[in-house]
Amino acid sequence: MAFLLDTNVLSELRKGVKADAKVRQWAARTLGQRHFVSVISLGEIRKGIERLRPKDPLQAAMIERWLDTLRQNFGDHVLPFTDDVADCWGRIIAKTPLAVSDSLIAATALTHGLTVATRNVADFIPCGVPVLNPFG
């Protein structure tokens, strides 16, 4: 099985040994499987960095370094926004009122035949995308 990691899973895994035990166990169990990330999640992380920067520039810089590492580690497993994803997104959003970022992540997963790993299962179920909650 292959997974598209939602932003909340990426953020949790960033905590390392302090991350939720169930998420750490899930990540260890699925290590040999294919994990992907959407450019939409990278954009959400960037938004968080920029909102944090005026209040806590040191923390923002730390998260920015993590984001750079994340991009490098995922390499070609960072999935772009493509024409196919745009078409799928249009079909989703026409029928289901969702947050733009969630619907774009769902469209990316559907286009690539991936299961979304997320804490926010209820946000993705209306899209018809397979979901898994690694938080339990």
Where are these regions (language model features)?
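Residues at the C-termini of beta-strands that transition into short coil/loop
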Residues: 39-40, 82, 120, 135
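Aromatic- and histidine-enriched alpha-helix N-cap/loop-to-helix transition segments
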Residues: 37-40, 104
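Short, well-structured N-terminal submotif of metal-dependent ribonuclease cores
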Residues: 1-38, 51-69, 136
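Acidic, PIN/NYN-like endoribonuclease modules and their adjacent C-terminal/linker elements
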Residues: 1, 106, 110-136
